[in-house]
Amino acid sequence: MINGIINLKKEAGMTSHDAVFKLRKLLQEKKIGHGGTLDPDVVGVLPIAVGKATRVIEYMTEAGKVYEGQVTLGYSTTTEDASGEVVARSSLPAVLTEELVDQTMTTFLGKITQTPPMYSAVKVNGRKLYEYARAGESVERPRREVTISQFERTSPLNFTEDDLCRFSFKVACSKGTYVRTLAVDLGRALGVESHMSFLQRSASAGLTLETAYTLGEIADMVSKQEMSFLLPIEYGVADLPKMVIDDTELTEISFGRRLSLPSQEPLLAAFHGEKVIAILEKRDQEYKPKKVLI
């Protein structure tokens, strides 16, 4: 059995499920999952867990994400990104400066509330929102709280002859954030229709785009029996607090017994040497093995 983490660079036009399906065939391994869905048009880091590493995939999914993208001011779309149909146009504000954009972006920092876009996989009454949207139906969408730790402009404002304005941005955010919606809400705060015209995920669960592999690159390596793209399972718990345990504690964990440890964290990744051996959960002032990985 193959075990480990893959830092996959998902390409545009592919769903996250497509990527998993192709890797299952390529590696001849059924036990494969991904750590955080990317929309088909979005490129970038898609953490993949293989074999035993699938047991820690939930902790990769919960980790924060970093995205880089582009906002277009001047019109909005059905999907809130460039793939949708134009639904409204508006003239740019009489005063639109980099200082105004930067100041407005800071108002989105911290905890904010978002309404998921209709073209999303959020379920309402057992149906995904995009199913309602495709059927021409509307439904009340549940608002959700997310955290934005960074949201900044990374390029000059680019004004076009057709009364549009585009600029690049970078955002660091919590799980469940809709960056499309963030782009639309930013435009609304500036008094103009807008949409997200490009997006890539540059980091997720401690993995970065610079060290990611495309499916083509992985296929080429597999054909040469080269498996260096496979990272240790420890990468899957990189965002959890780490606790190093001794031999006695290792034995206790292997029998599923509770431990008294000097920590107040709700979850711990227990390491013995350089290897993660369990996920521990705080229960009544003690830590109970939630998942034993040895």
Swiss-Prot record:
The active site annotation covers 39 (nucleophile)
Q: Which GO terms describe its biological process?
A: mRNA pseudouridine synthesis; tRNA pseudouridine synthesis
Q: Where does the source fall among the domains of life?
A: Bacteria
Its EC number(s): 5.4.99.25
For this chain, the family text in UniProt reads:
Belongs to the pseudouridine synthase TruB family. Type 1 subfamily.
Disulfide bond sites: none
Q: Spell out the reaction equation it catalyses.
A: uridine(55) in tRNA = pseudouridine(55) in tRNA
Q: Does the keyword Endoplasmic reticulum apply?
A: no
Q: Which Pfam families match?
A: TruB_C_2, TruB_N
Q: Which residues form a coiled coil?
A: none
Function of the protein: Responsible for synthesis of pseudouridine from uracil-55 in the psi GC loop of transfer RNAs.
Q: Carries keyword Phosphoprotein?
A: no
Q: What is this protein called?
A: tRNA pseudouridine synthase B
NCBIfam families per the UniProt record, alphabetical: TruB
What is the organism field in this record? Streptococcus pyogenes serotype M2 (strain MGAS10270)
Example GO molecular function term?
Answer: tRNA pseudouridine(55) synthase activity
Kindly state which keywords UniProt assigns to this record, in alphabetical order: Isomerase, tRNA processing
